[in-house]
Structure formats: structure tokens, C-alpha cells
């Protein structure tokens, strides 16, 4: 894992790891079940998932693709690897602890990439998105799933500092960073409607 001087709130995920699957993951289940569908996966596709956590999303991936799944939190990855040992995944998964700001992959390695509930908790979301673009092939799809409102509002402004302290992330203008990065926004869909205000943003590398 590459070291750098960015501050990460990964320590709190050591506390969340034992309870994540039971108490937190269900609120994200709708988005997790949908986020691979826009990729229109083909046999042999190589996918990157950034911020894989305990691997709860990987049960939705077919067995004919290969996935590199990264997370900064080793306690979360321990849970994900345990799932793999138990045979929970059909696809071939390679788990790695890694800082998403400095992805340890060569350019144009992946056919498509997904990142769920991660860009709002990293120190520099635009840097991370640019790194994901770098390692994804031209014309590849990048799917972003995250808690998102176009406008933060008064309650959002009040709640934002507490979200950050709890490791739940900060308000990020995803459409703005998508535009800044030069991605083409193909589609957006509200997901996790009952429990959170989340959106799935489907982008294409031009």
C-alpha cells in the first residue's frame, strides 16, 4: 500500500467492520444490486471496485468476469476475504488494501469501474475519480453510487460536520466533479430510496 500525507478516517471503520453487514449494509442493498447492471458485462471483462468494504456488493457479479476490489480499511477487507473463503462469490476476486488516491495499477487496465459510498469519505474525491479514470479503458463505464442531493440545504449544512466525524462522508457535488474530470454523464437513478437519499450516476470515459 502506497503511503502519502492525506488524512483518512479509516480508524472508525475498524469499529464499523464487525457490525457493518448487519446494521449498515441493508440500507445500501438496492444500490449494490443495481450498480453492475449498467456495465453490460461480457465474458472476460476486468472490473475495478473501489471501496469494496466487506464485499457485500460482490455477490451480484457473474462468474465470467474478473474483479480487483480495493479498500483502505484492512478490518473491512478481512470480512470480505472471509466471504470469499466461504464461497460467497461467483467471480474471481482479487482483494487489495490500497489508497484510492494513488491506485497501484497501470493505465487502461480495467474495462469498467464502480465506486460505491466511497467518494464522499475520501480526502480528495476528484483526485480519486481521476485515478479511476486513469486505470479504466477509453469508452469504459464508471458507475458512482453515493448519498447525494443536488443542493445541500440548511439541514445538510448542519449535518455535514457530524457525517464527517462519523466517517459517513461529506457533501460532494458529484455532477461538478464529473464535469471537471471530463466524463460523460449517461444516466442517473435514485437508489436506496427507503433508507437513504442515494443516486447511481453512470458515466462514460470519452
Task: Label each PLM-derived region with a short phrase.
Residues 126-138:
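A short glycine-rich, Lys/Arg-flanked "PGG" loop and its adjoining helix->strand segment in the class I
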Residues 42, 122-123, 136-137:
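Helix-to-beta-strand junctions that scaffold the AdoMet/dcAdoMet cofactor pocket
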Residues 1-42, 56-57, 79, 86-87, ...:
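Conserved class I S-adenosyl-L-methionine
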Residues 3-7, 24-26, 143-199:
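C-terminal alpha-helical "lid/dimerization" subdomain adjacent to the S-adenosyl-L-methionine
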Residues 101-112:
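A short acidic, Gly/Pro-enriched loop at the edge of an enzyme's catalytic core
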Residues 48-102:
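Class I SAM-dependent methyltransferase SAM/SAH-binding core
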Residues 112-124:
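A short SAM/SAH-binding and catalytic strip from SAM-dependent methyltransferases
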Amino acid at each position: 500500500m502506497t503511503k502519502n500525507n492525506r488524512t483518512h478516517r479509516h480508524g472508525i471503520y475498524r469499529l464499523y467492520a464487525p457490525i457493518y453487514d448487519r446494521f449498515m449494509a441493508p440500507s445500501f442493498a438496492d444500490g449494490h444490486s443495481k450498480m453492475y447492471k449498467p456495465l453490460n458485462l461480457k465474458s472476460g471483462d476486468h472490473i475495478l471496485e473501489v471501496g469494496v468494504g466487506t464485499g457485500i456488493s460482490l455477490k451480484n457479479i457473474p462468474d465470467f468476469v474478473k474483479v480487483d476490489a480495493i479498500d483502505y480499511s484492512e478490518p473491512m477487507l478481512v470480512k470480505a476475504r472471509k466471504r470469499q473463503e466461504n464461497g460467497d462469490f461467483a467471480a474471481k476476486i482479487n482483494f487489495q488494501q490500497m489508497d484510492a488516491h494513488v491506485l497501484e495499477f497501470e493505465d487502461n487496465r480495467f474495462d469498467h469501474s464502480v465506486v460505491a459510498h466511497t467518494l464522499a469519505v475520501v480526502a480528495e474525491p476528484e483526485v480519486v475519480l481521476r485515478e479511476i479514470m486513469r486505470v479504466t479503458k477509453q469508452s469504459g463505464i464508471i458507475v458512482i453510487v453515493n448519498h447525494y442531493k443536488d443542493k445541500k440545504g440548511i439541514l445538510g449544512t448542519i449535518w455535514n460536520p457530524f457525517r464527517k466525524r462519523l466517517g459517513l462522508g461529506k457533501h460532494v457535488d458529484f455532477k461538478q466533479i464529473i464535469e471537471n474530470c471530463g466524463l460523460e454523464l449517461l444516466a442517473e437513478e435514485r437508489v436506496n430510496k427507503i433508507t437513504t437519499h442515494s443516486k447511481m450516476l453512470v458515466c462514460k470515459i470519452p
